UniProtKB/Swiss-Prot annotation:
Enzyme Commission number, as recorded: 2.7.7.6
A Pfam family the protein falls into: RNA_pol_Rpb1_3
Biological-process GO terms, alphabetical: DNA-templated transcription
Name of the protein: DNA-directed RNA polymerase subunit beta'
GO function terms (MF aspect): DNA binding; DNA-directed RNA polymerase activity; zinc ion binding
Organism for this UniProt entry: Prochlorococcus marinus (strain MIT 9312)
Length: 1366
């Protein structure tokens, strides 16, 4: 049926012919390839390729069916073959025992070298770890060979080998060995797990392996959370990147370089940016062609190493990416569709594999040198170096003495004698290690050299390791070490070894002496068991009377009473109460003191020990305190302890009874201001104790307090009299006139009152208390030593209340307290004051109180011998109750010898105490009988196997002490190798015990360059974090100049730039220089080791290029350099974990991070300094300035981390829904921002259809591009254009007309047939429906296809010079 109706077209998938190159951009029809027959083993990889091929050539449905058939096939044959896994399938290779045996031999040889002091502790550790690592790898090979040759159909082997499940590292643990494990600090334990899971682990191995297992689990848990958050940030930064244009028409591109002549998948699906020509200038691939695998192969065949391709990084589409710059959509391997949300796809592609990345890495604890480039001899013969060879001595990390080549040369192995073999040539590069000498005869299969490829400057860091002593004895240095004193900035002096050499410890029994002991034997004296080696004495400081106490624990206490004081005229009386014992002191005149501290307790200086019980200062009720003028008190820090009286006088007391209550007012049984007698009931159940006037305080009908003030009330209306007195009250002296008819003979307290009867004066009586200047002290008797401390008692009077204080109380209070406190002078801290109860000398029934100052001396018990102190014997030199003088010896402790031997004292500076001595015993020496003349002399140091005479060899390490004609005496010792620059903790001749630190080895290990690996590294890159201790980067290109300072440490580094400007760089300590003198460097190159700060890198690139190019080009070029390095860094992390991600995804994210610049100087534009703005916008503004002749804006490119970039997007709705909601929304409100709803997120939040996929409308973009050169303004013009509403493509909508527009444009007119089917599908009657989508626009509305925009809007644009008048 031929139809004349308009065809329905879709704007999204349109076949646009490119006039120049004529390439259709839609999917080509699926190719039908002829069947081909392949006969080979299909493993996981082959399956992958098969499914992928099927998908590309035959489409989804066929591929799904094929995959299903493959699955059935797999199950069928697995069932037929009865494949299963049982314990018997885990076959341990027979070679395992030999391999482990070899490793153990190597390691015991290494341990022996270490024992003989031939290698350092670090070298031993490194060698052990490397040996096990190598063994493990060889074992994996053995496992593979064993399965391949003996049991190729083993189910475990098939499973791991085909890629169905598991990998070699797991199979290795099942049937090889579990291998080395790391401890919780991440250092490798040098004890590997030699067994596998088939043989079973020992308990120790199980515990060691559990470290790693726990680490793995914790890691996984943390990883999922981190990875999820990374994905969220990525989605946020890239969600508005949608393919919105066909071709942005850019001329910029990026260069992809081949690795080893291969491009791999890096070119697939990209469009060429220019014609690709081969070496003969023939066109292979025209510009703008999508590269498929065939074309990629063609490029490689033509040996082209660099290809320029289009990339999202250089796409000039506004706020989006165009189809040609993006290339293929990897879902179907055809050019990406318009409206594809490539930003979200990129974010998910980078975020999803995050869980597969590891979080942290292990340190190896030493340089793990993998045996790289090892050359072994193939024939036996003589080694010959070529004439230009230059070598120097070198010590490998394993402590092997080797040679290092200084230049490139050729080494030959020439066969000797009638050997017909060809000679073997080895090309030696500079820096390689040689294990043979020139002219040396070697056999075949010997390690000849380790070739180092290229002069790679590795970044190294300093690490340290302690050397701990294994036996007690005396330290001796080898002369080679040449220790030198180094003073650091703080003035601390350390000893450092200058050369590689040995530190010896010669055996002996070392005794630790107590602090005050001194040796009583001289050096070189022979001693036997029980000889006294040293003596320590303990003496009294002040002297006094000795008291011996019972022993406590392993020591005995001797107390010396230096000062005592007894209270003679007081009896000590003990009372028992239910709360415990109470002690009182009673004098003959009846004065009573209450004791605060029980006898037997210790007290300190200034402490109150007793209070005077004195009823004279006790009142009957509460009241008001007034001090008379003579009475004065010391200022107290706090009134808690009262106020100490400094001068006696009279204390005045005005009694007043206060009942504090909380009851209803209805219970009140008296009236306010009424006179009552003592014993009256004022409130139910509360009686007054005194007569006087009642004052009632109430609040909200609740009684608070009732006061009864004693005295007499006199009515008075005389204003003059009343004004003399206040309501608070005044004191009136005796004889002073108050009112007519009142004769006052004592002090009165007068208050003005208003009562219900009228006004008047209340005259209150005043009680007087006399306070003496000094409190009475009890009678004391002293016993004191000449030099000893003084002890005394002091009586203190304290007033409880301050002047004018009102005490609210019903019961009486104590106004004055007298305390007895202790005073002592010249007492040392170890002295204590004891309170004791003593019987009276004359009357045993009376107890007296005694205060004594004791000097306490702890005397050691006798001990049997222990490892470091020897046995001790202590004697007391005093008896109980005897008197001693100051400085008398109380006890002596002797240190006794444990075994027979010779004493040696260490060398000490005069007056320094000797803290250790050594006894050289018989068992520390070995006598070796000799038949020939000895070849060693006294003082020589030998190790096992060194010759002593013509035929005898040393059987132990040590120092020769005696040489006679028939024998040699050797003192056993232990050598420790120390490397240059090690810090020595001991000096020559020092005595050390087992476990003491001897030295701190300082060694260099390769900086594990990617300690920050996996996820944290990805996060560091994408968040553009500034690393700590970052590398120093070269600012502008030039030539390096390195100068050595005065001392070894200081080096100055500078770069001479092109105008002979010298730029000096500040070097921090511990930084290694990565460039050499005279080297040519460019901006952004690393000068020292350390992580690179991406912000600094961008600045260096920019400042370097800015000198040669205009601003906009410099910004573009520096940004593109940084983009490349960021993309590569991110790729490296994923590649190292075996994750493949297409470059274009990372490029989309990096594009978002580098799209902004910071305005430095606004020129004549409307921009603000410090503003972050898109580079494209600044470019447009500056172009406009160039036309009008205004000053352009100056700017510098910036790099934003993904979080920062998300918060800096144009859309405030998107930014607010991400982080810092309040801040973003407040700023948007203040600045009056509009959100144009360009991204997905904004539309989802508002609830519209998202502008991607079918909701993407290309109409606005097309109209804008037809309208003129500035798409941005048109796109943002809200009136004037009808936005294509986001509807499904098979409906259209009749929009309400915009008042400024006379008519409207309609998209995608459906045909009548389409409308009919839709109506039927929804059951709509056409006549009754006024629903916009189903009403056909009538012809009267005169729609025309070529709609003109709003004329007013056009005029506005022309005035701004953004549209031409045409």
């Amino acid at each position: 049926m031929t139809s004349s109706k308009p065809k329905k077209t879709s704007r999204v998938r349109k076949t646009t012919k490119n006039s120049k190159k004529n390439i259709p951009l839609t999917m080509p029809p699926l190719a039908k390839t002829p069947p081909s027959f392949k006969n080979k083993v299909v493993d996981k990889k082959a399956l992958k390729n098969l499914v992928s091929w099927a998908y590309k050539t035959h489409g989804t449905a066929i591929t799904a069916a094929m995959a299903d058939n493959l699955k059935d096939l797999g199950f069928k044959y697995a069932t037929q073959a009865a494949v299963s896994i049982s314990v018997d399938d885990l076959k341990v290779p027979a070679a395992k025992q030999d391999l482990i045996g070899q490793a153990e031999e190597q390691i015991s040889a290494t341990e022996e070298c270490y024992r003989l002091g031939e290698i350092t502790e670090v070298e031993r550790h490194t060698k052990v770890i490397d040996t096990w690592t190598e063994t493990n790898e060889r074992l994996v090979d053995a496992v593979k060979d064993n399965f391949n040759q003996n049991d190729p159909l083993n189910s475990v082997w098939m499973m791991a080998n085909s890629g169905a499940r598991g990998n070699m590292s797991q199979v290795r643990q099942l049937v090889g060995m579990r291998g080395l494990m790391a401890n919780p600090q991440g250092e490798i334990i040098d004890l590997p797990i030699r067994t596998n899971f088939r043989e079973g682990l020992t308990v120790t191995e199980y515990v060691i392996s559990s470290y790693g297992a726990r680490k793995g689990l914790v890691d996984t848990a943390l990883r999922t959370a981190d990875s999820g958050y990374l994905t969220r940030r990525l989605v946020d930064v890239a969600q508005d990147v949608i393919v919105r244009e066909e071709d942005c028409g850019t001329e910029r591109s990026i260069v992809v370089e081949a690795e080893d002549g291969k491009f791999g998948a890096r070119l697939l699906g990209r469009l060429t940016a220019e014609d690709i020509l081969d070496s003969e200038e023939k066109l292979i691939i025209p510009q703008n062609t999508a590269i498929d695998p065939a074309l990629s192969g063609k490029i490689e065949t033509a040996s082209i190493t660099k290809v320029k391709i289009r990339s999202p990084l250089t796409c000039e589409a506004n706020r989006s990416v165009c189809r040609r710059c993006y290339g293929w959509a990897l879902a179907h391997n055809h050019l990406v569709d318009l409206g594809e949300a490539v930003g979200i796809i990129a974010a998910q592609s980078i975020g999803e594999p995050g869980t597969q990345l590891t979080m942290r890495t292990f340190h190896t604890g030493g340089v793990s040198t993998a045996e790289s480039g090892v050359v072994r001899s193939k024939i036996s013969g003589r080694v010959e170096f070529s004439s230009k060879a230059k070598v120097r001595g070198y010590r490998t990390p394993h402590g092997v003495e080797a040679k290092q080549a200084e230049v490139d040369f050729i080494l030959k192995i020439v066969p000797q004698g009638n050997n017909s073999n060809k000679s073997q040539k080895v090309e030696v590069s500079s820096g390689s290690l040689l294990f043979v000498d020139d002219g040396e005869e070697i056999s075949s299969d010997i390690t000849v050299a380790q070739i180092i490829a290229g002069a790679v400057k590795k970044s190294v860091e300093k690490a340290t390791k302690d050397v701990v002593c294994d036996l007690a004895g005396q330290v001796k240095y080898d002369k080679v070490i040449q220790p030198k004193e180094v003073t650091d900035r703080q003035g601390n002096i350390t000893l450092k070894a200058q050369r590689l050499g040995r530190l010896w410890v010669l055996a002996g029994d070392v005794y630790n002496l107590p602090p005050n002991a001194r040796p009583v034997v001289s050096s070189g004296k022979s001693v036997v068991e029980g000889t006294v080696l040293a003596e320590a004495s303990q003496s009294s400081e002040f002297g006094g009377q000795v008291r011996l106490r019972e022993s406590v624990g392993d020591s005995r206490e001797v107390q010396i009473v230096t000062t005592s004081m007894s209270l003679n005229n007081f009896k000590l009386i003990e009372e028992s109460t239910h709360s415990g014992q109470i002690y009182n002191l009673e004098s003959s005149d009846g004065t009573l003191y209450r004791l605060n501290t029980a006898p037997g307790s210790k007290v300190s200086n200034g402490q109150v020990i007793a209070d005077l019980t004195d009823e004279r200062f006790r009142t009957k009720t509460g009241g008001l305190v007034k001090y008379s003028p003579g009475l004065s008190v010391k200022k107290a820090r706090s009134s808690k302890n009262g106020f100490e009286v400094s001068q006696g006088g009279t204390l005045l007391w005005i009694p007043q009874e206060t009942h504090e209550i909380n009851k209803d007012i209805s219970l009140l049984m008296t009236e306010d201001m009424k006179w009552i007698e003592a014993g009256t009931e004022v409130v139910k159940d509360i009686f007054s104790q005194t007569s006087g006037i009642v004052t009632v305080t109430q609040k909200n009908d609740i009684l608070r307090e009732i006061t009864v003030r004693n005295g007499t009330f006199h009515e008075c209306d005389d204003e003059e009299v009343l004004n003399r007195f206040t309501e608070e009250g005044n004191l009136v002296n005796p004889g002073e006139k108050i009112l007519d008819g009142i004769d006052n003979k004592e002090i009165l307290f007068v208050q003005k009152l208003e009562t219900s009867k009228g006004r008047g004066l209340l005259l209150r009586t005043v009680e007087e208390f006399n306070i003496p200047d000094q409190a009475q002290l009890p009678n004391l008797s002293h016993v004191k030593q000449e030099k000893g401390p003084h002890l005394g008692l002091k009586a203190i009077q304290r007033l409880t209340y301050k002047d004018g204080e009102l005490i609210k109380s019903v019961d009486g209070v104590e106004l004055l307290r007298t305390h007895l406190s202790i005073e002592s002078f010249n007492a040392t801290p170890q002295m204590t004051i004891d309170v004791e109860s003593m019987e009276d000398e004359n009357d045993a029934s009376i107890n007296r109180l005694n205060l004594v100052i004791l000097e306490s001396i702890l005397v050691r018990r006798d001990t049997m011998s222990d490892s470091s102190h020897g046995s001790t014997h202590t004697e007391l030199q005093v008896k109980n109750n005897t008197l001693v003088k100051a400085g008398d010896v109380i006890a002596t402790t002797q240190i006794l010898c444990k075994e027979k031997g010779l004493v040696q004292l260490p060398n000490v500076v005069e007056d320094d105490p000797i803290r250790r001595l050594i006894v050289e015993r018989e068992e520390d020496k070995i006598k070796i009988k000799i038949s020939n003349k000895a070849v060693v002399k006294v003082g020589d140091r030998v190790v096992d196997g060194d010759p002593i005479s013509g035929s005898e060899k040393a059987i132990s390490c040590g120092e020769i002490e005696e040489v006679s004609s028939s024998s040699v005496t050797l003192r056993i010792g232990r050598p420790y190798m120390v490397s240059p620059d090690s810090v020595l903790h001991v000096e020559d001749g020092d005595l050390v015990l087992r476990g003491d630190g001897l030295a701190l080895l300082v060694f260099e290990r390769q900086k594990t360059g990617d300690i920050v690996q996996g996820l944290p590294r990805i996060e560091e890159l994408l968040e553009a974090r500034r690393p700590r201790d970052s590398a120093i980067l070269c600012n502008k290109s030039g030539v390096v100049q390195i100068k050595q300072g005065n001392d070894e440490e200081s080096v100055s580094l500078s770069v001479i730039e092109k105008d002979d400007l010298v730029n000096e760089y500040q070097l921090l300590p511990g930084k290694n220089i990565m460039v050499s003198d005279g080297q040519q460097v460019t901006g952004g190159e690393v000068l020292t080791d350390g992580p690179i700060n991406p912000h600094e890198l961008l600045d260096c690139y920019f400042s370097d290029i800015r000198d040669q190019k205009p601003l906009i080009d410099a910004a573009r070029e520096s940004i593109s350099k940084l983009q490349r390095s960021l993309v590569n860094e991110v790729q490296n992390v994923y590649k190292s974990q075996g994750v493949a991600i297409d470059d274009k995804h990372i490029e989309v994210i990096v594009r978002q991070m580098t799209s902004k610049v910071r305005i430095e100087d606004a020129g004549d534009t409307t921009l603000l300094p410090g503003e972050l703005i898109e580079l494209r916008q600044v470019e447009d503004t500056n172009q406009a300035m160039a036309i009008t002749g205004g000053a352009p804006a100056e700017f510098t490119p910036v790099l934003l981390g993904i979080t920062k970039a998300s918060l800096n997007t144009d859309s405030f709705i998107s930014a607010a829904s991400f982080q810092e909601t309040t801040r973003v929304l407040t700023e948007a409100a203040i600045e009056g921002k509009s959100d144009w709803l360009r991204g997905l997120k904004e539309n989802v939040i508002i609830g519209r259809l998202i502008p991607a996929g079918t909701g993407f409308s290309g109409f606005v973009e097309e109209l804008a591009s037809e309208a003129g050169p500035h798409p941005d303004i048109l796109a943002e013009e809200s009136g004037g254009y009808r936005r294509a509403q986001n509807l499904r493509p098979d409906y259209t909508v009749d929009m309400p007309q915009s008042p400024a527009v006379s008519s409207t444009a309609i998209l995608d007119d459906p045909s009548d047939e389409d409308l009919e089917t839709t109506r039927n599908r929804h059951g709509i009657d056409p006549s009754s429906s006024n629903f916009a989508a189903f009403a056909r626009p009538s012809a009267e509305n005169q729609f025309s296809e070529d709609q003109l925009p709003d004329p007013a809007a056009l005029e506005g644009l022309q005035e701004e010079g953004l549209l031409s008048d045409e």
